[in-house]
């Protein structure tokens, strides 16, 4: 699908979509429990992949109004009767690969062409050390993956610099191992807030994880635990909301109120602080969960460390493109291992809109200026598409392709933007 975007501003109120990362974890922990209610889940392409995988392991998931009623398999996953297809979802693939280590048989997991390019080596290696048997069919650490159950607890270490999803997956599976597990992180743990979200959810499900007090890079996980997630309401998603907040900050005459943004462990709440640093007119009523942004102020350049919040990189890159001065997005090599190599995608597309940009191995240097309309490629990546849509609001006369990819995390993105006043036109494919 292609859309064209004209110069626009945004006005009005919008409810932030529910958090993708919390939804993935809530569904997974509910499947490992007996019976649970997950309230206000995000139902997107990625989270539907987690629902399908949970059902293949033996859970029953029913939708009732805005809730999911989940009858789980009580910590004993069945051997799936078919290949698990995680579609485009890295979280689904990684979490379910670890859960496959708890079965009495063999599980095969795969995904779409993009997911089959993403690395899984550290997770496979650690599962093998823990007594399961895990490999890639092509011997390249990428899906399709084959996992034979047999997970036992022991002392292991895992590389932390590629993806925090490997650590989250093991933190979820290891409490059901026969013995306790000690998991030590080697190197710098990237995207740490996502691990904190996992631990927060595990505690709510009655599962104990002891974190090493010094620097939080060692986890002691007692075995033979039981999951009991009763009921959980999914909070709003700061990653998805970042596009709404940035849209208002970037455009003259805009004023937007985004609801359902309460304080949480999400690292991407950093977008509020980043917008403040850049000089945006933004207020956050934490108790009410309401963020208000008024456009019109000239944004200033910023230095942004992407270590903990890789999903904000496309949003910050577009903010930098309209800010005064030269911004740097640093510590961002792990952003290359997402649905696409997002640093390369941004470095390819933003210059088409007139942006002066320098790409290095783990950074982008962006000098703000005037944007001009162009035809740009969305790279089949929801975050690239949504960030280019923001640039289009400023540049005008901008056409973006592969826009159907927003279904991964924010299915109503274009509808919400249109309701807020963005001039969007769908172009029929020839």
From Swiss-Prot:
GO molecular function annotation: 3-phosphoshikimate 1-carboxyvinyltransferase activity
One Gene Ontology term of the biological-process aspect is: chorismate biosynthetic process
Q: Where does 3-phosphoshikimate bind?
A: 20-21, 25, 163-165, 191, 311, 338
**EC top class named in words:** transferase
Q: What is its EC number?
A: 2.5.1.19
- Keyword Transferase in the entry? The reply is yes
What are the record keywords, sorted? Amino-acid biosynthesis, Aromatic amino acid biosynthesis, Cytoplasm, Transferase
The protein's annotated catalytic reaction(s) are:
3-phosphoshikimate + phosphoenolpyruvate = 5-O-(1-carboxyvinyl)-3-phosphoshikimate + phosphate
GO cellular component terms, semicolon-separated: cytoplasm
Which pathway does the UniProt entry assign to this protein?
Metabolic intermediate biosynthesis; chorismate biosynthesis
User: Could you tell me which Pfam families the record lists for this protein?
Assistant: EPSP_synthase
This protein's record includes keyword Nucleus: no
**Where does this one sit in the cell?**
Cytoplasm
What InterPro entries does the entry give?
Answer: Enolpyruvate_Tfrase_dom, Enolpyruvate_Tfrase_sf, EPSP_synthase, EPSP_synthase_CS, RNA3'P_cycl/enolpyr_Trfase_a/b
Q: What residues form the catalytic site here? A: 311
Residues involved in phosphoenolpyruvate binding: 20, 90, 118, 165, 342, 383
UniProt subunit comment? Monomer.
Free-text function comment from the UniProt entry: Catalyzes the transfer of the enolpyruvyl moiety of phosphoenolpyruvate (PEP) to the 5-hydroxyl of shikimate-3-phosphate (S3P) to produce enolpyruvyl shikimate-3-phosphate and inorganic phosphate.
As for family, the record states: Belongs to the EPSP synthase family.
* Name of the featured protein: 3-phosphoshikimate 1-carboxyvinyltransferase
């Amino acid at each position: 699908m292609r859309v064209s975007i004209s110069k626009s501003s945004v006005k009005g109120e919008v409810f932030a979509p529910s958090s993708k990362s919390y939804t993935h974890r809530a569904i997974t922990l509910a499947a490992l429990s007996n019976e649970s209610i997950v309230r206000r889940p995000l139902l997107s392409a990625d989270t539907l992949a987690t629902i399908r995988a949970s059902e293949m392991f033996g859970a029953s998931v029913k939708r009732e109004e805005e809730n999911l009623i989940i009858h789980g398999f009580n910590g004993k996953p069945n051997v799936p009767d078919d290949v698990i297809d995680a579609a485009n979802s890295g979280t689904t693939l990684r979490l379910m690969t670890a859960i496959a280590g708890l079965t009495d048989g063999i599980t095969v997991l795969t995904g779409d062409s993009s997911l089959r390019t993403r690395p899984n080596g550290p997770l496979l290696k650690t599962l093998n050390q823990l007594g399961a048997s895990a490999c890639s069919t092509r011997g390249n650490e990428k899906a399709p993956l084959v996992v034979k159950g047999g997970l036992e607890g022991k002392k292991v270490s895992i590389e932390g610099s590629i993806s925090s999803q490997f650590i989250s997956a093991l933190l979820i599976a290891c409490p059901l191992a026969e013995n306790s597990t000690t998991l030590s992180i080697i190197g710098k743990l990237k995207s740490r807030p996502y691990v904190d979200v996992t631990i927060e959810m595990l505690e709510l499900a009655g599962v104990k994880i002891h974190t090493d007090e010094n620097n939080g890079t060692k986890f002691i996980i007692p075995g033979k635990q039981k999951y009991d997630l009763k009921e959980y309401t999914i909070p709003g998603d700061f990653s998805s909301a970042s596009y709404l907040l940035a849209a208002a900050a970037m455009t003259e005459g805009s004023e937007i109120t985004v609801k359902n943004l309460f304080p949480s462990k999400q690292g991407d709440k950093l977008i509020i602080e980043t917008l403040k640093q850049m000089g945006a007119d933004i207020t956050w009523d934490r108790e009410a969960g309401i963020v208000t942004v008024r456009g019109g102020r000239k944004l200033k350049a910023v230095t942004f460390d992407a270590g903990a919040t890789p999903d904000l990189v496309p949003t910050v890159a577009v903010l930098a493109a309209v800010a005064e001065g030269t911004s740097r997005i640093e510590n961002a090599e792990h952003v290359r291992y997402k649905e696409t190599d997002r640093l390369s995608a941004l470095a390819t597309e933003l210059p088409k809109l007139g942006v002066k940009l320098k790409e290095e191995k783990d950074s982008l240097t962006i000098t703000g200026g005037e944007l001009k309309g162009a035809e740009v490629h969305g790279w089949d990546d929801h975050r690239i598409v949504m960030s280019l849509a923001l640039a289009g609001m400023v540049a005008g006369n901008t056409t973006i392709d592969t826009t159907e990819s927003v279904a991964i995390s924010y299915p109503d993105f274009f509808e919400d933007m249109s309701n807020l006043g963005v001039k969007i036109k769908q172009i029929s494919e020839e």
